Curated annotation (Swiss-Prot):
The gene is folE. Gene3D superfamilies: 1.10.286.10, 3.30.1130.10. Its EC number is 3.5.4.16. GO terms for cellular component: cytoplasm. This is GTP cyclohydrolase 1. HAMAP family: FolE. The lineage of its organism: Bacteria, Bacillati, Bacillota, Bacilli, Lactobacillales. SUPFAM superfamilies: Tetrahydrobiopterin biosynthesis enzymes-like (SSF55620).
Amino acid sequence: MSDFEKLQETVYQLLELVGENPDREGLLDTPKRVAKMYQEVFSGLGRDPKDEFTAVFSEGHEEVVLVKDIPFHSMCEHHLLPFYGVAHVAYLPSNGKVTGLSKLARAVEVASKRPQLQERLTAQIATALDEALSPEGVFVMVEAEHMCMTMRGIKKPGSKTITTVAKGIYKENVHQRQEILSMIHHD
């Protein structure tokens, strides 16, 4: 039995265990749909976000590069419920070395497609960029709403969790960090 078939069977059993009839008309294809969905939302497993930085250019650019409001969704590893929001990814090039802007979004995508904690997600994005480019500094901010806080437990819809990771000059120099924060919050 393949992993995909095992996953379908597990979803079928889950439906039975919660008191549902997995053989009723509306649920007949649900195990297959859920198995496909999990393959998609966990497609970052076994992949390194650093590998997304395949295009590196010497452009002589010495100022901040920021891609903000990168949408993402991930799955909380504690409850397997979604969390979603935006990531802001900035770096200060070293020796003019830059990467394609889409590579920043791709790294966010790979890191988010796995059972995850927001704190770890933020760190994985920052570390991947730092290791791939060796820039003067990296700053990553992730803002997300967690369904585990909305649908269950404390039930606080609309609450946002914000996590940051600063490396290099953005960790060492408060003025540099303030510049990035003002750019992120500028519309």
